[in-house]
Structures are given as C-alpha cells and as structure tokens.
C-alpha cells in the first residue's frame, strides 16, 4: 500500500517518467518493463475512462514503474472513482489558484480531512477491505500533484505552494506557452524563463517540481534546476515517429508531420 513514488519525491530522488496516451493495458505493461520510474495514464487528452485506467493499473502493478493518473478535470466525483480503482498519485490539470488546489487535496482524503466517499467494500484500492485499517491509512498515501498551465496560475504559485497536502507542482509547457502567446513554441525564451523560475521556486518551497519535455537537453536542464518528476516522452509520439522513420527507410510515402511540442 505504501506509495513509493510519493516517498521518492519526499526524499528528493528524481523520477523519470513516460506519458501514456494509447489507452491500452497491453502497451502499458510493455512500457512498464522499459525502466521508467513512473508512467502517466492520461485521462485529459487521451481516450481513457475509469475502466481503461483500471486495466492499466492492473497491467503496471507487477513492475517497478509507478502509475500516475491524470483525470480530465479537478472533479471530486471522477477523482473518487479513480482512487477507488487503485490510483494513489494524481496529476490534477489546470489548477489556477490555492482554492482549487485545496479542492483537489480534499477530494483525495476521507473525512474529516476531506470529502472522499467511503466505499472501500467495493474498492480495488482497499483490496475489497482485505487491507487492514485501509480507511485509517489511505490519506497518508495519497500523492497530489497539481498542474499549473497559465499566467494566472504562475502568478498564484506562492499561494498554491502553501496548500497543505500538495506534494508537487507540474508545469504544463504546451498550455503555458499558448497562454503566453507562443502556441506550439514552449522553447521560446520568455516561456523558458518562466518555467525555470517556477522550477526553482517550487523546489525551494519543499514541494516537488515536475514537467513533461521530450527535448533531452531541456529535460537535463530542468533536472539540474531541481525538477523531481520529469516525463521525457509520450508513447504515441514514440510509436508514430518510429513507424514513419521505418517506412521512410524502406521507401514508403511517409506522411510529412510538422514537429510538435512533445
């Protein structure tokens, strides 16, 4: 039951991850054996639901990689369902201020600390009440990562960092660059300056900074600045680009694709 991902962040051990967008338990298991510290099952931009997340959690469970799940929104009902199927670490998107961060934390805690509904007899998380004292232990194993993706969220970062129960803050470079007027260009100097400043600020607060970036040089730079959970690729991108490159090498008509953010 111990959340080893949360423990690693608390100990200051950098965790390298991979984004999962294929919404497949089969590919999730394949990638769980690849050597990443964590795998992000994306419910915001990939066609996932509670059932597909459940199958991915089951597929990843035998491997050292730790699962992180991103719901589609900061919604306590959706969060409750994801926790009941076994999610312990959540990446909550588009958190704009401290109040929204508190709502995310409360959604992961049983009363009186929060508002998570008690349904452990039906929950994989408690192994259907086979885990002794699950209701008493669960709150401490929840890891809440909130995602800041706009100028407003950046402005409110000091207050977000003061919220008890927030374990880490993830910077969303794609949405942030769009909000700053540089859509599709997260490497713009102004965007990079904002990202670097935020990473340092988050780490100095005692929280864990995180980010997704497929550029290896930038990923290493963020780690040097103190980022603790860094996703360095996306499964859909890896598959698409590798397939195109293979087709091109054998003379097939590969589709010309403009390089994306990831």
Curated annotation (Swiss-Prot):
Pathway: Aromatic compound metabolism; 4-hydroxyphenylacetate degradation; pyruvate and succinate semialdehyde from 4-hydroxyphenylacetate: step 7/7. One of its GO terms (cellular component) is cytoplasm. The active site is at 45 (proton acceptor). Its cofactor is a divalent metal cation. A divalent metal cation binds at residues 149, 175. Its EC number is 4.1.2.52. The record marks 84 as: Increases basicity of active site His. Keywords: Aromatic hydrocarbons catabolism, Lyase, Metal-binding. It catalyses: 4-hydroxy-2-oxoheptanedioate = succinate semialdehyde + pyruvate. The keyword Membrane does not apply. GO terms for molecular function: 4-hydroxy-2-ketopimelate aldolase activity; metal ion binding. Substrate binds at residues 147, 174-175. The record marks 70 as: Transition state stabilizer. It is an enzyme of class 4 (lyase). Binds 1 divalent metal cation per subunit. The keyword Metal-binding applies. GO terms for biological process: 4-hydroxyphenylacetate catabolic process; phenylacetate catabolic process. Homohexamer; trimer of dimers. Belongs to the HpcH/HpaI aldolase family. Catalyzes the reversible retro-aldol cleavage of 4-hydroxy-2-ketoheptane-1,7-dioate (HKHD) to pyruvate and succinic semialdehyde. This is 4-hydroxy-2-oxo-heptane-1,7-dioate aldolase. The lineage of its organism: Bacteria, Pseudomonadati, Pseudomonadota, Gammaproteobacteria, Enterobacterales. The gene is hpcH.
């Amino acid at each position: 039951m111990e959340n080893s991902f949360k423990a690693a962040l608390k100990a200051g051990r950098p965790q390298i991850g991979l984004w999962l967008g294929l919404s497949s338990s089969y590919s999730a298991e394949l990638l769980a054996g690849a050597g990443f510290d964590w795998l992000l099952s994306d419910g915001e931009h990939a066609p996932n639901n509670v059932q597909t997340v459940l199958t991915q959690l089951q597929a990843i469970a035998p491997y050292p990689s730790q699962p992180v799940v991103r719901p589609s929104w900061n919604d306590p009902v959706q969060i409750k369902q994801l926790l009941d199927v076994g999610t312990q670490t959540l990446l909550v998107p588009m958190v704009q201020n401290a109040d929204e961060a508190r709502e995310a934390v409360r959604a992961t805690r049983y009363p009186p600390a929060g508002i998570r509904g008690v349904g452990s007899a039906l929950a994989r998380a408690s192994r259907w009440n086979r885990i002794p004292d699950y209701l008493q232990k669960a709150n401490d194993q929840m890891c809440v990562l909130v995602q800041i993706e706009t100028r407003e969220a950046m402005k409110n970062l000091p207050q977000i960092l003061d919220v008890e129960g927030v374990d880490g803050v993830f910077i969303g470079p794609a949405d942030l660059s769009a909000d700053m007027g540089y859509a599709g260009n997260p490497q713009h100097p102004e965007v990079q300056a904002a990202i670097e400043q935020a990473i340092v600020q988050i780490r100095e607060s005692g929280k864990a900074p995180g980010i997704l970036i497929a550029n290896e040089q930038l990923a290493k730079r963020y780690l040097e600045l103190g980022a603790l959970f860094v996703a360095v690729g996306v499964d859909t991108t890896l598959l698409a680009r590798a397939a195109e490159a293979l087709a091109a090498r054998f003379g097939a008509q590969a589709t010309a694709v403009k390089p994306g953010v990831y």
